[in-house]
Curated annotation (Swiss-Prot):
Keywords: ATP-binding, Chaperone, GTP-binding, Hydrolase, Nucleotide-binding. It comes from Pyrococcus horikoshii (strain ATCC 700860 / DSM 12428 / JCM 9974 / NBRC 100139 / OT-3). NCBIfam families: lao. This is Putative GTPase PH0274. Belongs to the SIMIBI class G3E GTPase family. ArgK/MeaB subfamily. GO terms for molecular function: ATP binding; ATP hydrolysis activity; GTP binding; GTPase activity.
């Protein structure tokens, strides 16, 4: 493996292999990830990050395949990070039907990487956020982050993306109820994919009703999430979806909300890093504090006071 500085120089020159190697490093070596991000950070902050989320089987990869085409038609450099729940057997990402996107892999203007959540409680891993920064520094104009909308991931995608696209399909049972469990709150654009299926009009109607109930909220924000009907396999509605993504980007920039979002993102990231550092220090030092643990065991000290004492000693170092 080449030295990090050499890889970064190659990244600046548009070397795709260097990008792949840097992402592998941030995935597998936290100490190297720290060095890489420090060095490339001034080059970041230019890409528009679009989260594509929704339940399994919603056809996200098919849609994304078509969205890549739309972006490339405009000459944009595209990055794609496809996040999968970690395979319990290999620790790698489960590729599934994402193979169809690989036809773009010979296009020098498209970089696609599949990543696992890797034990971050089902959420987006720190490595995913670092990979986004690497693609940003590489010069991607738009970075799509595709996730399965389950567990913690759908919450994390809001902290990561500038624009969140929620993809649903007819036939999920109580469609809006299924989505409502946290997902309604996070979407900037709704997509009813596989709109040629029976029940698509009902899904569209239910989403419209649910959004209309939040009328005051949208008026305050200045953006009401549009609902786009698509058929990913034929490309129907994809151009309209791409236009709405661009429209939302323009809204964020002109309203000042993009700067707000990014500030919140940085705050969250710094807090996460601090929490990780403290957790590691506590884990490494806990054996030194056997006396404190014994005091809690003997009811001479409560767990909160014990935690305060341990943190005091660790932070004071």
């Amino acid at each position: 493996m080449q030295p990090i500085d050499e890889l970064i120089e190659r990244l600046k020159k548009g070397d795709r292999r260097a990008v792949a190697k840097l992402i592998t490093l941030v995935e597998n070596d936290e100490s190297k990830a720290k060095v890489i991000i420090k060095k490339i950070y001034p080059l970041t902050g230019n890409a528009h990050i679009v989260g594509i989320t929704g339940p399994p089987g919603a056809g996200k990869s098919t849609l994304l395949d078509k969205l890549i085409k739309e972006a490339r038609r405009e000459g944009l450099i595209v990055g794609v990070i496809a996040v999968d729940p970690t395979s319990p057997f290999t620790g790698g990402a489960l590729l599934g039907d994402r193979i169809r996107m690989q036809r773009h892999s010979t296009d020098p203007g498209v970089f696609i990487r599949s990543m696992a959540t890797r034990g971050s409680l089902g959420g987006l891993s720190k490595a995913t956020n670092d990979a986004i920064k690497i693609l940003d520094a590489y010069g991607c104009d738009v970075i799509f982050v595709e996730t399965v909308g389950v567990g913690q991931i759908e919450v994390d995608i809001v902290k990561t993306a500038d624009t969140v696209v929620l993809v649903t399909i007819p036939g999920l049972g109580d469609d809006v109820q299924t989505i409502k469990a946290g997902l309604m709150e996070i979407a900037d654009i709704f997509v009813v994919n596989k709109a040629d299926r029976e029940g698509a009009d009902i899904t569209y109607f239910e989403l419209t009703l649910a959004l209309d109930l939040e009328k005051e909220k949208w008026e305050k924000i200045g953006w009401k999430p549009p609902i786009i009907e698509t058929v990913g396999t034929t490309g129907k509605g994809v151009k309209e979806l791409w236009e709405k993504i661009k429209e939302h980007k323009k809204f964020l920039e002109e309203s000042g909300k993009l700067a707000e979002k990014r500030r919140t993102r940085i705050e969250e990231e710094v807090k996460t890093i601090i929490a990780g550092i403290v957790a590691k220090k506590v884990e490494a030092s806990l054996s030194e504090f056997e006396d404190i643990i014994s005091m809690v065991l003997n009811k001479d000290l409560d767990p909160y006071s014990a935690a305060d004492l341990v943190l005091e000693k660790i932070v004071g170092r």
